[in-house]
Amino acid sequence: MLYIVRSQYWFYFIAIFVALSLYFSNSIHAQEKTKLPNYVIEQYGEPPAIPTTQNLESIQSAVKVAFIDGVRQSNWGRDQTLALEEIANSKDPRYVWIISDLMRFSSGHQLDMELRDAASKLLQKKIPIENQWGVVTDHLIAWNIPAPPNYLEAKRTIFTTIIPGWDKIFVEGEIDWRHVSWGGVVIDDRKYDTTDERCNCIPAADNPEVSNVKDAAWLKDDDIVFGVEVNGEYRAYPRRIMEVREMVNDTLGGRDLGIPYCTLCGAAQAYFTDQMPEGVKRPILRTSGLLIRSNKVMYDINTYSVFDTFLGKAVTGPLAKKGIKLKQASVVTSTWGAWKKAHPKTTVLKEALALGRDFDFRNNRDSDGPIFPVGNVDPRLSVHEDIIGVITASGKPVAFQRSKAFLALKKGKEIAFENIRLRLAGDGIKAVDANGSDLGSHQAFWFAWSQFYPTTTLWNG
């Protein structure tokens, strides 16, 4: 009998403990008190505190009603409004991440207003009507507000319900889903070597047709190209074409390459996609239609493994589990005239690959900063300053301000940092070691390089 009584008391103890665990969130969920840089506080103010106790079960139920049920049913009614009010009254700014995700797709005045008011209450900030999604998301990133519980589930529901084709993309992995947003286009999910087929996407080009210099009369000498050299073979990828395609799967010098161009961060990169571990097929890279802090998100069409485009590292799927990280070849940003003079036997992509378009994104870039949210930007250089980025042999990221480095090299000065030596190539710049071997450098906007390499060294000239 005593055993039964004690067992009953033990049962009640467990029941009470579980109930309390569901009702209260403890300090584990509190925002880490990591000191923010002064420039972040000056621009965005102090972040709101995250409550250490709250009714998590009730809030999660409200999230389901407002964001999961509402999106799946394509309905925003009284139940959703009341659920959103409950979330706003929680004083927990973590839930603004989900509000931000729905903001990105919202086009209704009433819903926009309700989402803005809820975000404003939780962030303790007045949110402007204009660009409310951008302002909210910039604050979340800059303050490094943690994700709410079960965040990926809610985000996945919003994104995959509204835009088809992302079901295999939104999975757990080494990716910070807080920073993933919609780039305004749908996924390119065409199989390898079918890129002549039309798509309602940013259309990659597989095995693009090329010509020699003589037959490339359509290119002006001052047109910008991205030059790549592999095993003594040279190829120019005109920016006009890359602004349309944004992704090329090619073969040069006997090596397979995947070449993404992120128009938003001014970075063309060249990744080797051959010489994979046994059992791993060549990754065929595509544009997902998603962004991470204004940097395009690419993925492998064979496995739906997502890659960090800037780092070349697989972050989800089978390739992430195998630890795949792609090595880079240098990409030189040069004028066509200087590139062909330096490399008269170069090949170049054919004009037809531009599909008759000429976006000229670069020269129409917003002078006020990135057009998608990026949060705080390292203030050592201006946001859209061009840099040459490279990693040293010791693993240290280094950025060279392109304008200063170019002038120094033109004057015959040597630029060296650890094992890095900068060299002129056409009228662009590439990094090599003391033996002249390629170190996989590329040009990018400062905001992009510094956010993916926050500890980067900046060459001071």
Regions found by a protein language model. Name each.
Residues Y12-Y23:
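Bacterial N-terminal signal peptides
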Residues M1-Q8:
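N-terminal secretory signal peptides that target proteins for export/translocation
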Residues L82-E86:
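Alpha-helical segment of the N-proximal tetratricopeptide repeat
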Residues I4, S25-S27:
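A composition/secondary-structure signal for short, hydrophobic, low-basic-content segments
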Residues I28-E32:
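Boundary at the C-terminal end of the N-terminal hydrophobic targeting segment
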Residues T34-S74, R78-T81, V96-G461:
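Mid-to-C-terminal functional-domain signal that highlights helix-capping/loop sites
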